[in-house]
């Protein structure tokens, strides 16, 4: 049969994509196409951590006023928080929080390494992988990992443009 990846990293705001990925893999297991579920990692911006807190504590509470460069995952009341929590726990995954700087660095690195220009919210998933890989023993070095880099970079261009240094104009001298 087919083989699922060892881990999948998903940017999480409302938790809808994460819950959908969980359902998709669960369906593949139920029909016998894969034998096991990948670990699902929900990645959230440090300032928008409702799902992260819910997974960690088991207590749900809305966020006051989440703000982040990754506006697509800046959510005060996630519509799918319960299913997202279930997805992480049932797959023995984890939640990861990343800073705006880590998100923007991941966005630039992803573009330089692969040519994929994703919005900051999509780059958060890659930032989560980078953070987990830097930790001790979270994922084996030979793990097969999928990163869902959702949303085109042109959808949210202001944050990456702020990091671009435009060279000064040179006046013609001829």
Question: What are these model-derived regions, one by one?
Answer:
Residues 3-16, 20-23:
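Glycine-rich ThDP/TPP pyrophosphate-binding loop and its adjacent helix/strand module
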Residues 19, 51-52, 156-158:
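Short helix/loop capping segments that flank catalytic or ligand/cofactor-binding pockets
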Residues 12-16, 80, 114-122:
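Short glycine/threonine-rich catalytic loop with a Thr-x-Gly-x-Asp
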Residues 35, 62-64, 124-174:
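Phosphate-binding loop/pocket of nucleotide- and phosphate-handling active sites
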């Amino acid at each position: 049969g087919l083989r699922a990846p060892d881990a999948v990293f998903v940017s999480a705001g409302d938790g809808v994509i994460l819950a959908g990925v969980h359902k998709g893999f669960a369906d593949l297991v139920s029909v016998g196409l894969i034998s096991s579920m990948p670990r699902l990692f929900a990645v959230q911006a440090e300032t928008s951590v409702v799902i992260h807190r819910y997974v960690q504590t088991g207590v749900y509470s809305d966020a006051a006023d989440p703000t982040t460069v990754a506006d697509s995952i800046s959510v005060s009341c996630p519509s799918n928080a319960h299913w997202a929590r279930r997805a992480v726990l049932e797959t023995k995954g984890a939640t990861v929080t990343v800073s705006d700087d880590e998100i923007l660095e991941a966005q630039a690195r992803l573009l330089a390494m692969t040519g994929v220009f994703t919005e900051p919210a999509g780059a958060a998933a890659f930032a989560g992988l980078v953070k987990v890989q830097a930790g001790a023993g979270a994922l084996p070095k030979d793990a097969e990992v999928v990163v869902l880099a959702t949303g085109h970079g042109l959808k949210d261009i202001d944050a990456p443009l702020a990091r671009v240094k435009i060279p000064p104009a040179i006046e013609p001298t001829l």
